[in-house]
Regions:
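Phosphate/NTP-binding elements of NTP-utilizing enzymes
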Residues: 1-153
Length: 153
């Protein structure tokens, strides 16, 4: 729901969801979008459901909003290297390899969103925004270390 709100409030933003597996991320996203659109029909009206615009497949989904924003799922693998997004959500980060996250996923967020007037604002809250969602893990794992880093930082 957070990504949907960001897509509505920030035109032309590009966001992503990733997880340990690409199919897992796509399944989570599709399930939650359908649930939210059922509970709050206004969200369904903001998504462009036109043919070939919003895509839903077995291991990929992309939701395009009427203001040009979108969010999709990307794989937590080397094949995602070089993609560019403004922010993202790491779902079940306990299952994501810390090296891949640091070297491939986080660098995808190195671009600033272009506003409707064509300007960019590097200090904008959306840029490089990271949301981590996971179940309880163990000490000395990447998610635990990341939590401590964010709490202390």
């Amino acid at each position: 729901m957070v990504l949907m709100c960001k897509c509505i409030l920030y035109p032309r933003c590009k966001l992503f969801v990733t997880s340990g597996g690409k199919e897992q991320a796509a399944g989570i996203v599709k399930e939650k979008v359908q649930e939210i659109c059922t509970l709050i029909p206004a969200f369904k009206n903001e998504i462009d459901w036109g043919r070939g615009v919003t895509l839903e497949g077995k291991d990929y989904c992309k939701y395009v909003f009427k203001n040009g924003s979108y969010f999709d799922n990307i794989a937590a693998r080397e094949s995602s290297r070089g993609k560019r997004r403004h922010g993202g959500l790491i779902e079940e980060c306990v299952g994501v390899d810390g090296t891949i996250l640091s070297e491939v996923i986080i660098p995808t967020m190195n671009v600033s969103r272009m506003c409707m007037d064509g300007s960019t604002h590097p200090e904008e809250q959306l840029n490089k925004s990271q949301i981590y969602v996971t179940t309880a893990g163990w000490k000395n794992t990447f998610p635990y270390d990341k939590l401590i880093q964010l709490l202390v930082w």
